[in-house]
Amino acid sequence: MELVINPVKKLRGNVSVPGDKSISHRAVMVGALAQGITEVSNFLMGEDCLATVKCLRAMGVSIEGPTNGKLKIYGVGLQGLREPADLLDTGNSGTTTRLLMGILAGQPFTSIITGDQSLKKRPMARVTKPLQDMGASFLGRNQNNLLPMAVQGGKLKPIDFHSPVASAQVKSAVLFAGLFAEGYTSVTEPAVSRDHSERMLKAFGAEVEVKNQTVRIKGLPQLKGMKITVPGDISSAAFLMVAAAILPGSDITIQGVGINPTRDGILEVLKQMGAGIEIMHSRLQGGEPVGDIRIKGAELQGTELSGPIIPRLIDEIPIIAVAAAYARGTTVIRDASELKVKESNRISSVVRELRKFGATVEELSDGLIIQGGTPLSGAVCQSYGDHRMAMAMAVAGLAASGQTLIEQADCIPVSFPGFSDVLKEVIVE
């Protein structure tokens, strides 16, 4: 599928974005391991989250829906999962794969995880190594680094794991495995990554302690089913925020967005660059901070990003690069080598595609340098099958002169079903 983008004057109005992808995944997984019923509202009906639902059903969990974002999970408890009769196909979802590995590590059965061609290229050893230290066994390609991967669960022992990378997926996999180990399991990271797993496990009744960059969980808890309303996904909202920021005269409000402090780096950066941003009606929803984000177009300035803020906006870097291309001055992004192992190598993908618009972009080993302020022209762009690349280049096209065409845009529903329709709600031609 191709997506055609024509330049627009500005964005105006109120919109909402689909439910948070990270929280939707975790709600299904933790709900399945709890006793009793978990009801989820505003569940993200994207392909990645549906892969999580499918895998848990394959292990005997009864799940009703999702219908209009509503889901009912009949939890089986920590010991209730059953050996799947077939391969567990996680599609394009790295989150499903890595978090499930943590759960499967503690099961008394063998399972095999596979995925699509893109996922089969993504590294898994960062997750399998600590899980092996806990007592699970793995057999996969490239020395247990690539899917397909067989997982032989077993009796797990707790560990104190020092992660070499700030990755919520690695941390969550170890914490989920820690549910099945008697005693305390801890994960220490070089910088704080998103904390949705800790918040959700705590809400379901697990004993979780957080101190600086270390999270500690007590094994074998009694998790109890609950009702969860998933906030809007700030990573999806980021595309609308940048679109408004780069189009002078824009003024939009995105309602009910998760503003978790481990995910709000995009707000900080856009403010730094000069965008008018206001958070209204801040509230707590199921343990997660939520607010309505108002953003106005402005003349943006270049900025520098590195260090601890990077894990707080790692998924937003492609769209931040678009903002930088339309800003005055130079933007430097460092310490972001994690981008190389996403759905595409997002460093080289961003460089290649922004250059097609006429932007001046330099590739670094761990980031980018973008010289902003040059007027951009519409282009024919590749998505690389990467949903965030497709949407970032679509936003770049809104402010460019001439038409932009995004090839392979059918990957967008992975995280943002209805992206084009939401955009149309606020476009002023």
Swiss-Prot record:
Domain of life: Bacteria
Single GO BP term: amino acid biosynthetic process
GO annotation, cellular component aspect: cytoplasm
Enzyme class, first EC level, given as a word: transferase
Residues given in the record as phosphoenolpyruvate binding sites: 21, 94, 122, 169, 346, 388
Residues noted as binding 3-phosphoshikimate in the record, renumbered to the chain: 21-22, 26, 167, 169, 315, 342
Gene3D superfamilies: Enolpyruvate transferase domain
Keywords carried by this UniProt record: Amino-acid biosynthesis, Aromatic amino acid biosynthesis, Cytoplasm, Transferase
SUPFAM superfamilies on file: EPT/RTPC-like
Catalytic residue list: 315 (proton acceptor)
InterPro entries (UniProt xref): Enolpyruvate_Tfrase_dom (IPR001986), Enolpyruvate_Tfrase_sf (IPR036968), EPSP_synthase (IPR006264), EPSP_synthase_CS (IPR023193), RNA3'P_cycl/enolpyr_Trfase_a/b (IPR013792)
Pathway membership, UniProt: Metabolic intermediate biosynthesis; chorismate biosynthesis; chorismate from D-erythrose 4-phosphate and phosphoenolpyruvate: step 6/7
Catalysed transformations (reactions): 3-phosphoshikimate + phosphoenolpyruvate = 5-O-(1-carboxyvinyl)-3-phosphoshikimate + phosphate
Listed GO MF terms: 3-phosphoshikimate 1-carboxyvinyltransferase activity
EC number: 2.5.1.19
Membrane-crossing residue ranges in chain numbering: none
Subunit structure, as described in the record: Monomer.
Role description: Catalyzes the transfer of the enolpyruvyl moiety of phosphoenolpyruvate (PEP) to the 5-hydroxyl of shikimate-3-phosphate (S3P) to produce enolpyruvyl shikimate-3-phosphate and inorganic phosphate.
Xref: HAMAP family: EPSP_synth
Protein name: 3-phosphoshikimate 1-carboxyvinyltransferase
Native species: Desulforamulus reducens (strain ATCC BAA-1160 / DSM 100696 / MI-1) (Desulfotomaculum reducens)
